[in-house]
């Protein structure tokens, strides 16, 4: 198991499909905060609970100026069915082919199982990873770490952040 990318690292750009006909690139969000939520699989109980929680907290993410993107190695059709079933209002990106290439670039791929790690990244407006966290695969990491990181980013913009800035949670 490799280490996920640490804060202070430039977030690797990528282009992945949201639907069979629509692709989305991280670079499209230049100048905005982005949350990347890598997860092992649509339909698994923990992943379903995690994505449903993020859907409920989505207004808080957006109020803090952040867009949420979910990423797994599932195909676009699986994502569409999962998003429809869970009534998700954020994009699920398919890291399907080459399998797990984006997860690998972020150090968030479980080679032994062929799925993404349960890993979170908060990326700042300049495309730099501000906060990253890998959760045990069977544990929903919740949203508090993401919200705290976004609040810390806002505090730094206002001159109230800590001197260390970016942080990483293993």
Show which residues each predicted segment covers.
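Chalcogenol-based redox active-site neighborhoods
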Residues: 1-170
């Amino acid at each position: 198991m490799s280490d996920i990318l640490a804060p202070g690292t430039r977030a690797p750009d990528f282009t992945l499909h949201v639907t069979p006909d629509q692709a989305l690139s991280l670079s499209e969000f230049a100048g905005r905060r982005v949350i990347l939520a890598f997860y092992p699989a649509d339909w698994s109980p923990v992943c379903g609970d995690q994505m449903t929680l993020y859907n409920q907290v989505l207004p808080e993410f957006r109020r803090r100026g952040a867009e949420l993107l979910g990423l797994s190695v599932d195909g676009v059709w699986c994502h569409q069915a999962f998003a429809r079933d869970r009534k998700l209002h954020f994009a699920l990106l398919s890291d399907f082919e080459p399998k797990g290439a984006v997860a690998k670039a972020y150090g968030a791929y479980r080679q032994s199982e062929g799925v993404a790690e349960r890993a979170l990244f908060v990326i700042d407006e300049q495309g730099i990873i501000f906060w990253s966290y890998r959760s045990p695969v069977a544990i929903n990491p919740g949203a508090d770490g993401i919200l705290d990181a976004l609040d810390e980013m806002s505090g730094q913009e206002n001159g109230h952040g800590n001197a260390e800035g970016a942080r990483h949670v293993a």
